[in-house]
């Protein structure tokens, strides 16, 4: 496994979980519509650029949307500072009131593959699929930072068949299972050899940079669970969506 998916805050000793996918959140964009210089200059603030009004997708996730807003403002996505969270809320309200975004979930994948919007917030694995389907699409991670995430398998304490569960985890982690899983959905495998083979010469995702998570940016973070902040952000995101519906 890659070092980047080991020793994470939720399992620092790697005792309870086995990662199988990992990646980032970033911006998928149509290279025929979006100037890369705009992305490099504005980062997430491109979602406030009137040039792209009515031509953007937001992802219906309070966690990722607030990550985007907080990073656009120069803050940590793990902040519990009330004033910073309020600023991020105001940023998102400004976005939905002035930019007329479409707030979506998984439909962003096929829609961006078909070039229906100029840009959107997306998971790197979904961006890999989009770019694999449409060569006019690109993936950009702002220098201000992003969420570096991983998906992992765990076994509940009350599991009825832990031996079978361990066997499945072993299968999903070994080369063949990990290769099939990653190549089918486009999400980056935590298995080093699988990742190398899928990205390398002749691989399914050869040359698609979205498939290679960024590991060298000091502003990238792993989410830390905070129950109170989670509740607050969830409530504020509901208000953002109400503001969006009232605007539309």
Q: What residue ranges belong to the model's regions?
A:
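Sec-exported extracytoplasmic/periplasmic mature domains
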Residues: 49-53, 70-75, 93-97, 113, ...
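Extracytoplasmic ligand-binding site segments that recognize negatively charged/polar headgroups
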Residues: 1-113
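Conserved C-terminal helix/tail region of periplasmic/extracytoplasmic solute-binding proteins
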Residues: 110, 213-248
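A ligand-binding cleft/hinge motif common to bilobed small-molecule-binding domains
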Residues: 113, 119-136
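Mature extracytoplasmic/periplasmic domains
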Residues: 147, 151, 156-218
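Periplasmic-binding protein-like
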Residues: 86-95, 133-157
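Ligand-binding "clamshell"
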Residues: 11-14, 129-141, 203-206
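Alpha-helix capping/helix-boundary segments
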Residues: 108, 126-127, 177
